[in-house]
């Protein structure tokens, strides 16, 4: 019988008195649980992505809300069948979102609920801004959204400068969204610094919108930073039509893989036929490379980890290189 698991997404922007103590307490708690996670904590808050066996997930949520610094945290919950991270990772990270510049987060955009967001989308009065990376919005986004061609979070400040030149900040209302809401905490503050007067941010991000409104005005799937890679935003509506195309044959597809060629590891969209033909690789050239990790349809599109280099160390194509390394 399969276990029931929860996927949790949550964050808190606010002072944390002793982040290193919180990290140690998290690690101690997780020793007795069937969980996996990627959690970052600093003096400015916490950014968490977590999966765990349902009773353990419920125990963790109750425990975290009892911690003085995190009592106001809101969890976004999805039902899953297994853990979706390779391990338990709880780390200190000075920047919860790697923006690359300082921003006054005491001045933020107006948080609006999924219901308010949906109404404003129907009004069609605001510039709807997707503040995620280009590989994220490629497989899913809101209707009529502006889609910045950026590859990392750190590129957004320069994009904000261009946006302020292309649109009159005093007269252009902006509605921004991201996956779970945390990036908008910084990006909305940045747009306000650039002179935009009317900035709204989707409270809880696309995840919260999907949980509350279903598919609504969303098209495609939501990119996520875990073993699922992508998910429909509405659990009740899993059969979502792809809006992207296979990078090899251009047929409709929304499945991401990372290239089986160890020396490439490129993130790319591919259909079932092409991924099988190219042995999990992003190109014919990569499929002929010397260091290819074992790919099979059964493993699906889960990201490769270091342990996937070869089935056994004796078969490792880089073993000879390792033996020649100086001690």
UniProtKB/Swiss-Prot annotation:
UniProt keywords, alphabetically: Oxidoreductase, tRNA processing
What sections of the sequence does the record tag as coiled-coil? none
Q: Where is the Rhodanese domain?
A: 122-218
Which CDD domains would you find in this protein's record? RHOD_YceA (cd01518)
InterPro entries on file: Rhodanese-like_dom, Rhodanese-like_dom_sf, Rhodanese_C, TrhO, TRHO_N
Pfam families in the record: Rhodanese, Rhodanese_C, UPF0176_N
Which BP terms does GO give this entry? tRNA modification
Show the catalytic activity.
uridine(34) in tRNA + AH2 + O2 = 5-hydroxyuridine(34) in tRNA + A + H2O
GO MF term (any one): oxidoreductase activity, acting on paired donors, with incorporation or reduction of molecular oxygen
Active site residues per record:
178 (cysteine persulfide intermediate)
EC number(s) per UniProt? 1.14.-.-
Q: What does this protein do?
A: Catalyzes oxygen-dependent 5-hydroxyuridine (ho5U) modification at position 34 in tRNAs.
Output the PANTHER family linked to this UniProt entry. RHODANESE-LIKE DOMAIN-CONTAINING PROTEIN 7-RELATED (PTHR43268:SF3), THIOSULFATE SULFURTRANSFERASE/RHODANESE-LIKE DOMAIN-CONTAINING PROTEIN 2 (PTHR43268)
Tell me which family the UniProt entry assigns to this protein.
Belongs to the TrhO family.
| Listed name of the protein | tRNA uridine(34) hydroxylase
Q: Per the UniProt entry, what species is this protein from, by scientific name?
A: Chlamydia trachomatis serovar D (strain ATCC VR-885 / DSM 19411 / UW-3/Cx)
């Amino acid at each position: 019988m399969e276990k029931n698991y929860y996927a949790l997404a949550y964050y808190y922007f606010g002072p944390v008195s002793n982040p290193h103590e919180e990290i140690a307490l998290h690690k101690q708690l997780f020793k007795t649980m069937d969980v996996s996670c990627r959690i970052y904590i600093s003096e400015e808050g916490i950014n968490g992505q977590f999966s765990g066996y349902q009773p353990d997930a419920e125990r963790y949520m109750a425990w975290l809300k009892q911690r003085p610094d995190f009592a106001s945290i809101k969890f976004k919950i999805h039902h899953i069948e297994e853990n979706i991270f390779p391990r338990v990772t709880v780390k200190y990270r000075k920047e919860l979102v790697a923006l690359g510049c300082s921003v006054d987060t005491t001045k933020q955009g107006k948080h609006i609920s999924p219901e308010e967001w949906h109404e404003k989308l129907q009004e069609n009065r605001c510039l709807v801004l997707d503040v995620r990376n280009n590989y994220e919005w490629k497989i899913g986004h809101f209707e009529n959204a502006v889609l910045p061609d950026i590859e990392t979070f750190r590129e957004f400040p320069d994009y904000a400068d261009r946006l302020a030149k292309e649109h009159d900040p005093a007269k252009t209302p902006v509605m921004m969204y991201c996956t779970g809401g945390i990036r908008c905490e910084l990006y909305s503050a940045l747009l306000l610094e650039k002179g935009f007067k009317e900035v709204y941010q989707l409270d809880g991000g696309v995840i919260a919108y999907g949980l509350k409104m279903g598919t609504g005005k969303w098209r495609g799937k939501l990119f996520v930073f875990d073993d699922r890679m992508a998910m429909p935003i509405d659990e009740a509506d899993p059969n979502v039509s792809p809006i992207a195309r296979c990078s090899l044959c251009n047929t409709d597809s929304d499945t991401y893989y990372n290239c089986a060629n160890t020396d490439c590891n490129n993130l790319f969209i591919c259909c079932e036929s092409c991924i099988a033909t190219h042995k999990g690789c992003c190109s014919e050239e990569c499929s002929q490379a010397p260091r290819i990790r074992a790919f099979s349809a059964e493993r699906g599109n889960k990201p490769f980890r270091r342990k996937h280099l070869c089935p056994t160390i004796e078969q490792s194509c880089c073993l000879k290189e390792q033996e020649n390394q100086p001690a």
